[in-house]
Every structure is written in C-alpha cells, then in structure tokens.
UniProtKB/Swiss-Prot annotation:
Belongs to the histidine acid phosphatase family. It catalyses: 1D-myo-inositol hexakisphosphate + H2O = 1D-myo-inositol 1,2,4,5,6-pentakisphosphate + phosphate; 1D-myo-inositol 1,2,4,5,6-pentakisphosphate + H2O = 1D-myo-inositol 1,2,5,6-tetrakisphosphate + phosphate; 1D-myo-inositol 1,2,5,6-tetrakisphosphate + H2O = 1D-myo-inositol 1,2,6-trisphosphate + phosphate; 1D-myo-inositol 1,2,6-trisphosphate + H2O = 1D-myo-inositol 1,2-bisphosphate + phosphate. PROSITE patterns: HIS_ACID_PHOSPHAT_1, HIS_ACID_PHOSPHAT_2. The active site is at H82. GO terms for molecular function: 3-phytase activity; acid phosphatase activity. This is Phytase A. It comes from the Eukaryota. The gene is phyA. InterPro entries: Acid_Pase_AS, His_Pase_clade-2, His_PPase_superfam, Histidine_acid_Pase_euk. The keyword Disulfide bond applies. Its EC number is 3.1.3.-, 3.1.3.8.
Amino acid sequence: MGVSAVLLPLYLLAGVTSGLAVPASRNQSTCDTVDQGYQCFSETSHLWGQYAPFFSLANESAISPDVPAGCRVTFAQVLSRHGARYPTESKGKKYSALIEEIQQNVTTFDGKYAFLKTYNYSLGADDLTPFGEQELVNSGIKFYQRYESLTRNIIPFIRSSGSSRVIASGEKFIEGFQSTKLKDPRAQPGQSSPKIDVVISEASSSNNTLDPGTCTVFEDSELADTVEANFTATFAPSIRQRLENDLSGVTLTDTEVTYLMDMCSFDTISTSTVDTKLSPFCDLFTHDEWIHYDYLQSLKKYYGHGAGNPLGPTQGVGYANELIARLTHSPVHDDTSSNHTLDSNPATFPLNSTLYADFSHDNGIISILFALGLYNGTKPLSTTTVENITQTDGFSSAWTVPFASRLYVEMMQCQAEQEPLVRVLVNDRVVPLHGCPIDALGRCTRDSFVRGLSFARSGGDWAECSA
C-alpha cells in the first residue's frame, strides 16, 4: 500500500513566515468575529449544515469552555476543517446547468425570483473563498490567544491533508497565529514562525489518518445516498411544486431543489458582502424548509461517515490512535489508516511536543469524532422525521463540521489532582467524554480517557474493510 508525504520547505511559506501583520479583515462586522465566528443571519446561516461558516457554540455549552480555575493547560491539539470554499468542480457544473435551464425555460421572473433572470453563475471551484481564508486567519488568532501560556513559548507541529484548500487553510491559520505572537510583548522573542511540517497525500492508495480512503468496503457504501434520497423525498416535493408554479415553464427534480438551497450558502460566502447581505437564493425558502435542509445534511454525515454507517467510526480510528500517542508520548500503535513511515519518524510525528494543529476535510473529521466516542450518546438519527439538537445529543453537521470547524483536545494539570485531565471542545462546546468516568466539567483523567478508547486501540472494525 503506497504512502506519500511532502515536507514543505520554508520558502513555500514565505508569505506566512515574514512576520507581516494580519491583513485587515474584509469586514469589522460585529456579526463576524474572531471569538464568536459567523453570527450573521443566524436563523438561516446556522442551518446550512456543513456549508455553514464556523459559529461558536460557547453559548450552547452546558459547561463553560473557559479553562477551569486552578488548572493550567499542558497540551493542546486542534483538528480543523478547511475554511469556506467555492463549490466543487462537479457540483458547480450542476449548479450552473440548472440555473441555465431555468433561464432558458421560464417565461416570467417576478418578485423574489427576479434575480434569476440575469444571474450569472461565475463562482470558482474547490478553492477557499476570501471569506474562507479569513476564517482560518481568525482561527489561528483564537488558538494563539486561547492557549497563550503555551503558544508564547512553543511552535506548534502542523500537518495538513494534501488538498490545496486544506494546505491553504493551514497557511492562513499560521498567518493569524504568528501575527498575534509578534504583537504579544510576553511572547518568547526570536522564535521562527510555525510551518506546515507534513502534508499527507490524498492519493487513493495512501494511508492518511486525516482523510482515510483505503477501506474498500466503506468507500463502496451507498447507505448515505439511500438515506439522502429517502429523506429528500419527505420535504422537497412540496418545494418543487411551489417553484414550478412560480417559475412557469421549468420542471425540477427533488435533487435540484436541494441544489438551489446549496446556492444560498455558496453564493453568500463567495461575495464581499458576506456579513451584510444574504444571497437572494436564500429567500426562495422558508425557515421550516431550512430546518429540513439542515437535518438532511446531518443525515448524510451520520449515515455516511458517522455511527449510522457500520464502518464510519472505524475510518477515524487511525487518528484516535495518533492522539493517544501524542497524549502519552508513546509510539503509535495502529494498523488501520496510519502511515507507518511518517508515524515512526520523530521528524514527521514528534512525540515530545505539547502543541499540535492538523487540517483536513469534514468527512474525515466526522469519523474521528465518532471514533473518539464523543457522540456515543446520540441514538440512530430518524431517517423520516426531523430531530432537534437535544434529541440528537448535540450532533448535527452544522454543529460539528461547518467550514473552519475546530476540535480542541486539551490536557490540563489542576490543583489537588495528581493525574492530568483531558477534555474535548467541538466549536467551543465542551462535549462530555464517554467511556471513562467524567467529573462535573466533562473531563476524564488521561489514563482513563485512553482506556476508554478501546474501540480505537483495538483497530475498530478495520478487518471488515476488505471483506
């Protein structure tokens, strides 16, 4: 099985190692900030599933996300999704063709549909939008400030999955991190900027814990597609009928209804007015329809890469075992998606650091969240009826893997506690751990946390990948 990685030379990151200050944000809007993320038009934008921009869940956390009094963080790990992007090339072609079809067949564009008559699909493909770049700058700033007792004196070890938008996200994170450090009078002087230390290939034959792709049975699964089609059929037909009535001359499919809903997010995050103006696509749908759309995205993630798929959590086992190695300063023990060449080399997988940052995609992160058992309290999601966030025990695609999402794993030493404690935050929401005895703040001792990851330590169900 092939393995591949690229060690990035410093000159490739010259733009983020030169000590330049962070460029002024596209906006200084109070609804889009470093601490709270994207709170603009939240009644709609927070219902875009994985196409939602990062928004902080600190106010949704039953446990304060602040570092508890009497404790000091001794280890911090962030796992981040890339920032807001343009549609993928394949989806973009479908969106463009649909809009062209509407324009060619509809005779009258009235009211809220008027914009469609002259709308020109000109979005990019695959890469980060300027807004998405700023999301990661902000993420780097926030990470530095949150863990400043460590970041002032330590250079984080950084890995990225091999997609260009993921690498660019890591670079923008570094930009925010380093510019904040340079302005901190208490930071250790003379330290070099962080860099992306390892890029892991996304080739289909490569072992990659950030973006697994070598479990054949899992890759061939069509479960999520079936669930998606069935749930779409519960809410899209009524929307389709309304659109066809209002846009006389066009015939749509249920899937094309969801494409038009996708355009609400993509058209919004691709503009310079992202903080002041929603795309006109958004107004074509009601609040209840957005609730259904958001739940559809959650179903796709849960049954595609989460516990709803028999091999979903197993895809995250390799990363979970790497996390165990980092927390315990011991070699990686894993025979699933880990890259033995990289993980056995201190240059590409050091065990003596206390600050780590990894960058990846939404699907891989979903599997990792479930491999860590963070949503063991989530019962199988209904495939016919919308369930609210309480019923799903805090799981939704928008709450877990929006653009620029971030998982923080913290280890802390606290007064009157001999053993270090571990806790996890997902987008600033403390997620009480499962599989180990937790305290009132959702934490476990490090050793009990590791013992609780027995699913990962035993390799999950990887043996079934080639069944």
